[in-house]
Structures are given as structure tokens and as C-alpha cells.
Amino acid sequence: MRLYDTLSGGVRDFAPLRPGHVSIYLCGATVQGLPHIGHVRSGVAFDVLRRWLTAKGFDVAFIRNVTDIDDKILIKAADAGRPWWEWAATYERAFTAAYDALGVLPPSAEPRATGHITQMVELIDRLIERGHAYCADQEGNGDVYFSVSTLPEYGKLSGHRIDDVHQGEGVATGKRDQRDFTLWKGAKPGEPSWPTPWGRGRPGWHTECVAMCEAYLGAEFDIHAGGMDLVFPHHENEIAQAEAAGDGFARFWLHNGWVTMGGEKMSKSLGNVLAIPAVLQRVRAAELRYYLGSAHYRSMLEFSENALQDAARAYSGVEDFLHRVRVRVGAVVPGEWTPKFGAALDDDLAVPAALAEVHAARAEGNRALDAGDHDAALTYAMSIRAMMGILGADPLDERWESRDKTSAALAAVDVLVHAEVRRREDARARRDWAEADAIRDRLKEAGIEVTDTGDGPQWSLLDGTDK
């Protein structure tokens, strides 16, 4: 199997550190708000990697973290008048529901940043002792920074020259060099904080992931994955800390492309996001999964309604063939994938080529079925089930088999919407009618209507499905 490694800048042979075992760390969500389809693309892309490695016989340890302490979480929770931990927990559940709705396998472990403060403090202590980190010059303010100039190879992942680096953290009090980045943030009034040898505070984002990677996978592991927007500064700064601490860290760095609209990354700040509930009005969850996973994971996925509907039709074509075989021939169990399918996934997860094999088998299977060759049709159907299962989209899997719009996908949507409905109720309780109306309007833009009834607020999809 060959994978594109961002660090080396090319496709190279993959072999795990331990024969038969693969260790993967995927940067998960910063749980500051509801997920959109751009958020979950990495979950789908690397779920395919995990499924393929498992199908090949590897024992896969797959870690996906939750960033539950962050500047944006604190700001948004404060603006809403809610505890930061409640805010984070609410949207962590929303992300979990979104992953589940799209058939993403649960991770082997899903550590929260706040559960690993001890490991973060120990890591920072090591970096200070080795001369790669320092406490802020202002006595007792609690800030700790990584000294970029102490690591000559800094920038090797992203290609940034060390002299051109700017961390985007503004002019930080006590920072000796503007290229340096934050490891620990000194406590501020009203913010959560933890005790450390250098004062109370909370961790920096980059330190969180290094500590969690090593806590679960060790000082050296196989694959670190995430969106391409994380290459710099996040992943660059992870490498810097790990190597400065004397650890081997990740051997492969994999990065998925963005979901774009009009050539721009899908982002709340740009106002071009597509909420998952809104998309699930147009297509079923399995069809959305198929769409998000159909492009090569490293390519940009430009969203369009036509492309989404094309993907839905392609998925339905596979589904219809399998149903025809089951009705006319009998039970269809997963069989063997084709050699070309396996070769495609072994070539840096070339899902488009793998899907071409699926649709070639469907075409041949339909011809065999129409010709009355039931044995051949069944063989093709069994192969398709195996291939689509590896892609996480087997239409005959019990997860996807219901064609009813009020299936498990809608239950997941309910969890996503509940967080916003609760915020609206809180605003109404404060008699903040403007905020309550704004939340209702945002939900309506996502295709969800909220109606106040004697039994409390009820929401419905605009096609009339009530909850």
C-alpha cells in the first residue's frame, strides 16, 4: 500500500511500525458550534482508510480527539450566557450524531483535551528543561511559549522558511520572538484554569494534540491525519514540540482537501456553510456519505446541487441492482472485492477508481440478471457488497437499508437541531426576543421550522416531517 505523505511531499510505501498493527491519530472537532459537511469530510475520508486497513487484516487503533477547551468555545459560551463546559458538551454530542448519521465508525478512543492536562503539563516541563520553551518574561503571568529558533528544521512539514514564520497570535505579552507559539495560556478572570509550576492557566491548542497522541499511541506511531488547513500552524507546531522533546512522533502525515463553494473553503466565517440537516432534506444520509467520499481524499470537493444529486443517483443505481438480485435470486452476502478495487485503494486511497470498479460490476451484474444468469448476477452483487462496505456505504447494511426519510438519519438530525432549539428557549426565558427570533431564522435557513405549541417547541423539516 502506498500513501501520500505531506512531510516527504510524495507517495511512498506504507508499512506499520508493528507488523499487523496500525496506529492512527485524526485531529477531531473543536466543539464550538453545529457541524457542517465541511467538518465531517475528514471523518468520512479517514473512515475509509480505517475500513480498508481492517479489511486487509490489520488491527487498527484509531484515535480521534475532541478539543473541548478553546478561545472560540469560551467566547461563544460567554456570549450565550452558558457555562463553557455545557457549551462544549452540547456540540460534542452534535458532532457525534453527525458522524453516526454518516456511518463513520466510532474511534477506538475519543480523548477530550480537558482530560489530559497532566500529560500536557509534563510535556511542557520537558520542553522547558531541554531549552525549547520558556515562561513569559513578565513574572507570574503564566504564559509559556515554544522557542521556534531552537529548532532549525522548523517548517519542514509546511515548507515555511523559519525567518518568514508568523504565528498569527498577535503581539503577545512576554513573547521573546514573534515566531514563537503558545504552549500554555496564563489564567484570565472568569476563564477555566488548572495549576502548573509556572502558574494557573489552560493549554494551547497545539500542545493538546501532542499530549493526546502520545498518551494513546506512544512517542512514535504510524499516521497522523487531518484537514489540509491544519498543516500550518497546527501540525507544524505539533512536530516541533514532539521532536524537541526527543520523540519520533508520526511517520506519515495525511491531509484531506476541503469542501468548497465557489472555490472558497466552506467556513462559518465566510457564511457559506451547509448544515447537515439541510443537506439531509435533499438526499439520504447514505447518499451524502457516498458524495463526501466519492472524490479523492486529497482533492478539493466543490459542492454543487447537481453533483450532490448525481451522487445520489449513482448510489441509488447500486442499491437498485442489489435489491433486484435479492428479490429475483435470494440473499446477498458480502463476497470478495475485485483486484482492481484493491489496487485502487492501495494506491493512496484512489476512491474514484475504486468506485469505477463498483459501477462496472453493477453494469455487468444487471446484464447477467437480464440474461437470466442468476449465478453471475449473485457473484457481482456479493462483490459489490464487499466493496461498498469498505467504502462505508453498503446499501444492504442494516444502517442504510431503510428508504424511509424518518429513519435513523432523522433521529441524528434531531440531536443536531436540539442544541439550537435549547438556545432559543434560553433566550426566550431571558425575554431576549431578538436572539430567539434570530435562532429561529437561522434554523429556517437550514430548512428547519420551529413552532411554539402548548407542549413546548416542535421542529419540522419543511417537507412536513415533524419532531
UniProtKB/Swiss-Prot annotation:
Keyword Flavoprotein: no
UniProt EC number: 6.1.1.16
Binding residues annotated for ATP, in chain numbering: K268
Family matches, as InterPro entries: Cys-tRNA-ligase (IPR015803), Cys-tRNA-synt_Ia_DALR (IPR015273), Cys-tRNA/MSH_ligase (IPR024909), CysS_C (IPR056411), Rossmann-like_a/b/a_fold (IPR014729), tRNA-synt_1_cat_dom (IPR032678), tRNAsynth_Ia_anticodon-bd (IPR009080)
Top-tier EC class: ligase
Keyword vocabulary terms for this entry: Aminoacyl-tRNA synthetase, ATP-binding, Cytoplasm, Ligase, Metal-binding, Nucleotide-binding, Protein biosynthesis, Zinc
Cofactor(s) demanded: Zn(2+)
Compartment(s): Cytoplasm
Motif 'KMSKS' region, residue numbers: 265-269
Residues bound to Zn(2+): C27, C209, H234, E238
Pfam family, one: tRNA-synt_1e
One BP term from GO: cysteinyl-tRNA aminoacylation
GO molecular function list: ATP binding; cysteine-tRNA ligase activity; zinc ion binding
Superkingdom assignment: Bacteria
Motif 'HIGH' region per UniProt: ranges: 29-39
Cofactor note: Binds 1 zinc ion per subunit.
Catalytic activity: tRNA(Cys) + L-cysteine + ATP = L-cysteinyl-tRNA(Cys) + AMP + diphosphate
SMART domains on file: DALR_2 (SM00840)
Cellular component GO terms, alphabetical: cytosol
Family (UniProt): Belongs to the class-I aminoacyl-tRNA synthetase family.
Subunit architecture: Monomer.
NCBIfam families: cysS
Cross-referenced HAMAP family: Cys_tRNA_synth
Name of the protein in question: Cysteine--tRNA ligase
Gene: cysS
